[in-house]
């Protein structure tokens, strides 16, 4: 085994068959493999809140059967004849994308996540007409351009959530020039992405305030994650005292919420960076932005280049993800708990250690 040239394979995964979102075994054919492809045996796959949206058709764009999962870590089993970046036996990662046009402004700038013709790692159609399926499966085939090198020394189960949640917070801090030590940042929402935000911001030398709707995560934020301050959004006095204090806020909340209370926390030229996938309009009055030259912006995961840079940063700083490892037979329960925000802070599925039965 060493190279692959257009041989089809079957694999088995867990798929949602309808908007109930219940995952059951599903055997399917992997797309044709070619000279630029990498055949990967999946070891671990993270569970993201967007997976929950997809399996339940919350965004009205789901196609079934659907194998979710876009935080994939696995072992290279074979490579195509043109593959130069990877070799058999290496541990690699795959994130949210498996294709792009390679000729637009975004692709030319190596920010392929903003390509209008990007191809999602699941619930999409590949260039050969086959439906893409995700990481809750035994194996996958991915073009080498979208496969991520993983630095030696990083535990594979730790890497899985970094391929989405980790780079999601790292990318805007890098792009918007917010990596300077001493900045004061806010993390709105302390879930899977939010806990990554605290870790990355602290590692950059920032003063970090966690903002939440209740005080139930205060101890975790301050003692376990090392945040410097904790604000409860309903605490009028505390919010007023914190006005004009933050250089940026990373807003990870995945449901509709008012923006004005958080805009008031920003300094002049401060940035509110939206990351949650929300299918209802958000509202604010324009003076909240105008009178402080503040910005409401967004950011979407990160490029392969940014992901590899973030993984090196993670290794250099000695950071770890706070995860709960589960096997495939627990995945439906994991989604139930995720829907109730009952996870600390990210589920990772041990795919290699799971049994698949059709």
Curated annotation (Swiss-Prot):
Binding site for Zn(2+) 1: 48, 70-71, 164
Ligand binding (NADP(+)): 50, 168, 189-194, 212-217, 252, 276, 299-301
Pathway: Aromatic compound metabolism; phenylpropanoid biosynthesis
Tissue: Most actively expressed in stem, hypocotyl and root tissue.
GO biological process, one term: lignin biosynthetic process
Gene Ontology molecular function: any one: coniferyl-alcohol dehydrogenase activity
Reaction equation(s) it catalyzes: (E)-cinnamyl alcohol + NADP(+) = (E)-cinnamaldehyde + NADPH + H(+); (E)-coniferol + NADP(+) = (E)-coniferaldehyde + NADPH + H(+); (E)-sinapyl alcohol + NADP(+) = (E)-sinapaldehyde + NADPH + H(+); (E)-4-coumaroyl alcohol + NADP(+) = (E)-4-coumaraldehyde + NADPH + H(+)
Binding note for cofactor: Binds 2 Zn(2+) ions per subunit.
Record InterPro entries: ADH-like_C, ADH-like_N, ADH_Zn_CS, CAD-like, GroES-like_sf, NAD(P)-bd_dom_sf, PKS_ER
One Pfam family in the UniProt entry: ADH_zinc_N
Cofactor(s), by name: Zn(2+)
Binding site for Zn(2+) 2: 101, 104, 107, 115
Superkingdom assignment: Eukaryota
Keywords tagged on the record: Lignin biosynthesis, Metal-binding, NADP, Oxidoreductase, Zinc
UniProt-listed Enzyme Commission number(s): 1.1.1.195
Top EC group: oxidoreductase
SUBUNIT field: Homodimer.
Family, similarity comment: Belongs to the zinc-containing alcohol dehydrogenase family.
The protein's role, per its UniProt record: This protein catalyzes the final step in a branch of phenylpropanoid synthesis specific for production of lignin monomers. It acts on coniferyl-, sinapyl-, 4-coumaryl- and cinnamyl-alcohol.
Protein name: Probable cinnamyl alcohol dehydrogenase
Source organism (scientific name): Medicago sativa (Alfalfa)
Lineage of producing organism: Eukaryota, Viridiplantae, Streptophyta, Embryophyta, Tracheophyta
Gene name, Swiss-Prot/TrEMBL: CAD2
């Amino acid at each position: 085994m060493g190279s692959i040239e257009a041989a089809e394979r079957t694999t088995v995964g867990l798929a949602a068959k309808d908007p109930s979102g219940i995952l059951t075994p599903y055997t399917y054919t992997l797309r044709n493999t070619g000279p630029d492809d990498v055949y990967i045996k999946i070891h671990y796959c993270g569970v993201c809140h967007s997976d929950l949206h997809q399996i339940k058709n919350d965004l009205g764009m789901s196609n079934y059967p659907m194998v979710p999962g876009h935080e994939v870590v696995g072992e290279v089993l074979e490579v195509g004849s043109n593959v130069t970046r990877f070799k058999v036996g290496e541990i690699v990662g795959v994130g949210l994308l498996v294709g792009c046009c390679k000729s637009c402004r975004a692709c030319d700038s190596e920010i392929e996540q903003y390509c209008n013709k990007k191809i999602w790692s699941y619930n999409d159609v590949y260039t050969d007409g086959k439906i893409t399926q995700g990481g809750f499966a035994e194996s996958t085939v991915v073009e080498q351009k979208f496969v991520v090198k993983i630095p030696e020394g990083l535990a594979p189960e730790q890497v899985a959530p970094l391929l989405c949640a980790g780079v999601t917070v790292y990318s805007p801090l890098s792009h918007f020039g917010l990596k300077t030590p001493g900045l004061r940042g806010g993390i709105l929402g302390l879930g899977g992405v939010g806990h990554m935000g605290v870790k990355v911001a602290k590692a950059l030398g920032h003063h970090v305030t966690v903002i939440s709707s209740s005080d139930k995560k205060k101890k975790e934020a301050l003692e376990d994650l090392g945040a410097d301050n904790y604000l409860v959004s309903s605490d009028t006095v505390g919010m007023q005292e914190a006005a004009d204090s933050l250089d940026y806020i990373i807003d990870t909340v995945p449901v509709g919420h008012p923006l004005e209370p958080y805009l008031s926390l920003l300094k002049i030229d401060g940035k509110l960076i939206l990351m949650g996938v929300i299918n209802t309009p958000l509202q604010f009055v324009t003076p909240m932005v105008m009178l402080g030259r503040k910005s409401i912006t967004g950011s979407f995961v990160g490029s392969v280049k940014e992901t590899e840079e973030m993984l090196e940063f993670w290794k250099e700083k000695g950071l770890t993800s706070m995860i709960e490892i589960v096997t495939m037979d627990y995945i439906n329960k994991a989604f139930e708990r995720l829907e109730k925000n009952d996870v600390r802070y990210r589920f990772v599925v041990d795919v290699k250690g799971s049994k698949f039965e059709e």
